[in-house]
From Swiss-Prot:
Coiled coil: none annotated. Residues 272-296 have a biased composition (Basic and acidic residues). This is Prickle-like protein 4. It comes from Homo sapiens (Human). GO terms for cellular component: adherens junction; filamentous actin; nucleus; stress fiber; Z disc. Residues 257-271, 322-344 have a biased composition (Polar residues). Keywords: LIM domain, Metal-binding, Repeat, Zinc. Residues 82-147, 148-207 form the LIM zinc-binding domain.
Amino acid sequence: MSPQGPAVLSLGSLCLDTNQAPNWTGLQTLLQQLPPQDIDERYCLALGEEERAELQLFCARRKQEALGQGVARLVLPKLEGHTCEKCRELLKPGEYGVFAARAGEQRCWHQPCFACQACGQALINLIYFYHDGQLYCGRHHAELLRPRCPACDQLIFSWRCTEAEGQRWHENHFCCQDCAGPLGGGRYALPGGSPCCPSCFENRYSDAGSSWAGALEGQAFLGETGLDRTEGRDQTSVNSATLSRTLLAAAGGSSLQTQRGLPGSSPQQENRPGDKAEAPKGQEQCRLETIRDPKDTPFSTCSSSSDSEPEGFFLGERLPQSWKTPGSLQAEDSNASKTHCTMC
């Protein structure tokens, strides 16, 4: 690695020089790594009073416990022997090493190695967040502690949210791509990978010649985000042991080819009929059954039904006993009340 001058490792903030072309790439990287909506309520949409208070507390805690800025120092002969924490190679005299106070005085990195543990991007302006011995950019450090809504790119501070497709969404942000109606607590299909309500799904595939291939069906359900999730990213989603995989088969009775589940799920982890999976505290326990054959298996349902209900019923509604065609989805949904999975 060739020595780099201190100007290259400047810790100054990004600025737009009117005499030069703006550094849009650097600005975009800065906004990606340090989302303003994670830091200041002025950049957030539709925050309630409680959410605003939670955001302020969240920002203050991160600033106090994790935020830092690296310092670039020339490696002097007396400092020879320092090993880069990432590549494990020695820093040579005349090179610049980056030191992070929160990591300890003896730990240092090559400047290109001073990067986010999650995304691998070099930390712009050497701004870092320190968590469990690792460096993170602001975006991915925040996601260790709070779920991020894929629709609006804001962290979720409300107690209620919608869980679907292995992610958490603001309660009304998981919507049908056609009619924009919220799907929280209701069934949906995934034609082409985008959520679609049963009514729009039927309209789209009302033509008998249309293909169902690649269209899956699932059920979004409501849960709670919890207040403190400092144990790591694996707590931001439902435990994979409580979730079986996917749903609707392709037309013509062919077996399901595409299966969806949470990262890390496997056939060995799936619940068998009759098994009771223990859900993590503060998280909703829900299961989506894999449909192997349209003739043998009903639609998927949420597994958190009360044990006191009669067999064949779920939350007061009779479970479907036979394969439903697209034409019957709308009729069934128009008669059945909207079901929400709520936390006890």
